[in-house]
Amino acid sequence: MQIEKKDIRALSKDQLRDFFVINKDKAFRGNQVYEWLWSKGAHSFEDMTNVSKGTRQMLVENFVINHIKVDTMQRSSDGTVKNAVRLHDGLIVESVLIPTETRTTACVSSQVGCSLDCNFCATARLKRMRNLEPGEIYDQVLAIDRESKLYFNRPLSNIVFMGMGEPLMNYNNVIKAIDMITSSEGLGMSPKRITVSTSGVSKMIKKMADDEVKFKLAVSLHSAVEEIRNKIMPFTKSFPLPELREALQYWYHKTKSKITYEYVVWKGINDNKESVDALVKFCKHVPCKVNLIEYNPIDDGEFQQASPESINAYIKALEANGIIAKVRHSRGKDIDAACGQLANKEI
């Protein structure tokens, strides 16, 4: 029976060093291989030109490098780029490059499909197949960084975990990927340029705070009225608003990092005074800002963008209470790359 080889990128640098020592080689070989895997983005052991042929053969016999492949790439009329990324087992996720005049942002996926069941999101209609490995997350960023340099002549400036999946339900792998992205041996990006978005997994928000992470936190809130929130995001019955509020207060107490609430206003759902007042009240519990996001409809038409007047009612109420609020217009709608639209048909 053939033994399945392990993805070498699942090993830490210390584990790689130990592997070489156990196999009667020098520990520094682990450093060389680690640099090839992360700093240089090697997809094959044959790429490792300063490693001896015998050592490369030993690696081939024991490990694989499970790298991703950009299957298809689409460019929007507004400059947005969407990648359909094929994983080593044939599954596909999507990632997006969002350019503006001052920055280029990578929107990356953390799961194949999604663990949650938000009724307004196309990704949530996909069955969750599996979590992404740290290397698969890292490779999405690497691919978008290359595209940013190619198309916009500048490196990637920001990363948001707002693609397919709930990042906090793949917590360990997301953290490992971010550690490599921010490491001098990886991309060397500041954690302050990284935002992890969650739909409100309270216990994991507390864990992040305890782990003293340095990246930013965004919460897809969409309603501060429990009944409405439970209807549009059924899983939130397990994470009620008082529990979420407590977790966010704990986060701010530990990190002193302001929270961003992501909020879509829908016609006939949360475009009413009760919802506006509830959001204002919820925002007063912890320093925050609110992004009011343009809705990107999916096929069935159940959810519709609220009127500009309804959105302005939110802005006026929030600003009157000293809360920063901005309307975020979606990018890449013509290629289904906008928020809530990622749902590759091949999955």
From Swiss-Prot:
Organism: Flavobacterium psychrophilum (strain ATCC 49511 / DSM 21280 / CIP 103535 / JIP02/86)
Details of cofactor binding: Binds 1 [4Fe-4S] cluster. The cluster is coordinated with 3 cysteines and an exchangeable S-adenosyl-L-methionine.
Binding site for S-adenosyl-L-methionine: 165-166, 197, 220-222, 296
UniProt keyword list: 4Fe-4S, Cytoplasm, Disulfide bond, Iron, Iron-sulfur, Metal-binding, Methyltransferase, rRNA processing, S-adenosyl-L-methionine, Transferase, tRNA processing
Active site: 94, 339
EC number: 2.1.1.192
Annotated InterPro entries: Aldolase_TIM, Methyltransferase_A, RlmN_N, RNA_MTrfase_RlmN, rRNA_lsu_MTrfase_RlmN/Cfr, rSAM
UniProt lineage: Bacteria, Pseudomonadati, Bacteroidota, Flavobacteriia, Flavobacteriales
Residues at which [4Fe-4S] cluster binds: 114, 118, 121
Sequence similarity: Belongs to the radical SAM superfamily. RlmN family.
Localization per Swiss-Prot or TrEMBL: Cytoplasm
Presence of the UniProt keyword Cytoplasm in the record: yes
The name this protein goes by in its record: Probable dual-specificity RNA methyltransferase RlmN
Disulfide bond entries: 107-339
PANTHER family: 23S RRNA METHYLTRANSFERASE, RADICAL SAM CORE DOMAIN-CONTAINING PROTEIN
GO MF annotation, one: metal ion binding
Domain Radical SAM core, chain residue ranges per copy: 100-334
Miscellaneous comment in the UniProt entry for this protein: Reaction proceeds by a ping-pong mechanism involving intermediate methylation of a conserved cysteine residue.
GO terms for cellular component: cytoplasm
Entry function: Specifically methylates position 2 of adenine 2503 in 23S rRNA and position 2 of adenine 37 in tRNAs.
Catalyzed reaction equations: adenosine(2503) in 23S rRNA + 2 reduced [2Fe-2S]-[ferredoxin] + 2 S-adenosyl-L-methionine = 2-methyladenosine(2503) in 23S rRNA + 5'-deoxyadenosine + L-methionine + 2 oxidized [2Fe-2S]-[ferredoxin] + S-adenosyl-L-homocysteine; adenosine(37) in tRNA + 2 reduced [2Fe-2S]-[ferredoxin] + 2 S-adenosyl-L-methionine = 2-methyladenosine(37) in tRNA + 5'-deoxyadenosine + L-methionine + 2 oxidized [2Fe-2S]-[ferredoxin] + S-adenosyl-L-homocysteine
Top-level EC class: transferase
Cited NCBIfam families: rRNA_mod_RlmN (TIGR00048)
